Amino acid sequence: MNVATCTHQTHHAARAPGATSAPGAASGDPLGARRPIGDDECEQYTSSVSLARMLYGGDLAEWVPRVHPKTTIERQQHGPVTFPDASAPTARCVTVVRAPMGSGKTTALIRWLGEAIHSPDTSVLVVSCRRSFTQTLATRFAESGLPDFVTYFSSTNYIMNDRPFHRLIVQVESLHRVGPNLLNNYDVLVLDEVMSTLGQLYSPTMQQLGRVDALMLRLLRTCPRIIAMDATANAQLVDFLCSLRGEKNVHVVIGEYAMPGFSARRCLFLPRLGPEVLQAALRRRGPAGGAPPPDAPPDATFFGELEARLAGGDNVCIFSSTVSFAEVVARFCRQFTDRVLLLHSLTPPGDVTTWGRYRVVIYTTVVTVGLSFDPPHFDSMFAYVKPMNYGPDMVSVYQSLGRVRTLRKGELLIYMDGSGARSEPVFTPMLLNHVVSASGQWPAQFSQVTNLLCRRFKGRCDASHADAAQARGSRIYSKFRYKHYFERCTLACLADSLNILHMLLTLNCMHVRFWGHDAALTPRNFCLFLRGIHFDALRAQRDLRELRCQDPDTSLSAQAAETEEVGLFVEKYLRPDVAPAEVVALMRGLNSLVGRTRFIYLVLLEACLRVPMAAHSSAIFRRLYDHYATGVIPTINAAGELELVALHPTLNVAPVWELFRLCSTMAACLQWDSMAGGSGRTFSPEDVLELLNPHYDRYMQLVFELGHCNVTDGPLLSEDAVKRVADALSGCPPRGSVSETEHALSLFKIIWGELFGVQLAKSTQTFPGAGRVKNLTKRAIVELLDAHRIDHSACRTHRQLYALLMAHKREFAGARFKLRAPAWGRCLRTHASGAQPNTDIILEAALSELPTEAWPMMQGAVNFSTL
């Protein structure tokens, strides 16, 4: 395979003197928004070992002097971070601070603001990434004596345009509420946790993307003084600010010190979960605090190590990346003590200052930047991390792990649950572990393959359909889009997620090792560790599932039947004859973001089948999308309560329309009907390949953009070197080559499963068709025989044709499949149910608002036969 090997030093290469500027500069666009990654920087994005290090700022100290020599750089190694003197005449207008968690960034910011605010009229805008962080900053500022800072929560008007908002702390999603009188005149702009703040541009809750993007860009271009700080501030950010303000006006501070609570922390990745320890503890059910430890608690397991510390009287904090595991581990801990605090998205928010009252605190990513617990109360920290497509990314996990600043024993034990990662062979890891590489031990074949995969990933990001639509009005969004795709798509692979988290912890001055591998980590040992945790997670999955059952609430059906919001929901989305119990089951599934997304997509698919011209008119599809994907829908939360949740439609509908144009055609070919349970006909792998083939590459690109699934190309997977590397890094036994039809079947399964919640199931039918073979008509039998080139010239009657078909039964013995709709799919209004007398009055009213020219035309008149 003719692929150049890229070493872990690739991204440090200097830009040659006189080299051409990044694409976009020549056209008058200093941001290069048309191509967020310039060709001259391409090699930075194709080194599988150093890619994560570069994206999280680990190379800034080497990169800045080489690429922007006129930018000043200051490395601070021996104490908490400090900012440049605000009053110094040589101070530059833009200061970027990259320093680890626990390096005193916020304390230094408060000290700097105290010096910079030399007049009552000095105005300051602080932009944060979360509501909780906004409130925390306001409290810190008030306690430190910084006067007159207010939050956007205190505004009684939607637009804030004058005092007291001249010193304002605002979440980035509400930036459009700051009026022009203020926005154009701020003296100081502070972006605390700047990478997380920019990351919010990709959140489904960002409803004013174009306006927020433009306002942020204006502030970055014109504000006299800017402070941008983050533990993961990277070269992309510095390059962006240099392009806006000039490299001579940018100063970079790199803090290399972290307080002992982090630098002395020892992180250990555990190989096993230990569900047998969990089950044994729950069976004992002794009095709180009195659960006896086993004779020899198994070491190297999450629950075994946790039990040993709880039984020994230690105080423990536990991070869980999923709500369900947080509930399970809380039940386990309550066998040892009553003093357990559980914090997640479904529990009331807790005050971090009260954590010292508890022996065990369990939390999810709801506890993140801005919330910190400083007292030396906890002995150890445990972390359960489950990478999955709709879960928190590894940066969010890393930030949550830093909320407890001091651990008395200085130990962090991490279990990576690989059961949520994708197991299909079309998902291939593209990152190599940096510790293994530090000894120069990755074979050249590994680096060649993974570097090529990184290059393909970059190309897919550049080809993103969102680029053309977003680049026109959302420059910052387009500039940092690569990092967003990187963090979401790598969640499909356990190895990639583990390597990213490992890199983030290392960059934060922590010592990280893997259980049983204290010596130099070799490629073989790393791959064996991956395989071990992968199979352990699959074994433990069933035991955990049994513990996650919830008590049903029998009164919900009656409550749902009597609630007006539920009635409106049924009228808009569901068949009128749906039973209340079915509605309740559906609303439980809608409690999660992924459940709501798949529900809306399947509703839209049925709508496109009912209104076929939506596939030919963007205006018609946009009306359907606005009708179904906006507003609020009723859900039932984990507490069994009815709750209204707002839908968050995407601002870029173009790729969604393309997806439904393709999928509605496919659905029609498969005789799809949700109410009937799925596809009306079975199909073979060859049929799937034929369905996908006209637009195969577009399907892969749309799954990448809309489902964050980075599917590896079929021809690449056919390479022996790629197969060997993928098998080693996936933690799976060798799986052989992936044929063209197998690749198509995997892609088909991902399209329907990830986007619509539809299962691909093996059919028990031997012969193609929607019904039983005994019910085939004479014509249908003839078509089957002709399709397989079976001579039937001697047969005249149905009986003769049927006998001939059965005589050639083996020729139809190949695997056949069908699509199975989710259980709630039977509740939806479909094109079949639309034939009933009950018309969809609400949808008709929505479509009636479309102008006549939006509908298909024939010789200048509306073609009613196609509607």
Curated annotation (Swiss-Prot):
It is found in: Host nucleus. PROSITE patterns: HELICASE_ATP_BIND_1. GO terms for cellular component: host cell nucleus. Residues 86-251 form the Helicase ATP-binding domain. GO terms for molecular function: ATP binding; DNA replication origin binding. Keywords: ATP-binding, DNA replication, DNA-binding, Host nucleus, Nucleotide-binding. ATP binds at residues 99-106. Pfam families: Herpes_ori_bp. One of its GO terms (biological process) is DNA replication. Residues 1-39 are annotated as: Disordered. Residues 15-28 have a biased composition (Low complexity). Functions as a docking protein to recruit essential components of the viral replication machinery to viral DNA origins. In the presence of the major DNA-binding protein, opens dsDNA leading to a conformational change in the origin that facilitates DNA unwinding and subsequent replication. Belongs to the herpesviridae OriBP family. Homodimer. Interacts with the major DNA-binding protein ICP8. Interacts with the helicase/primase component UL8 and the polymerase accessory protein UL42. This is Replication origin-binding protein. It comes from Human herpesvirus 2 (strain HG52).
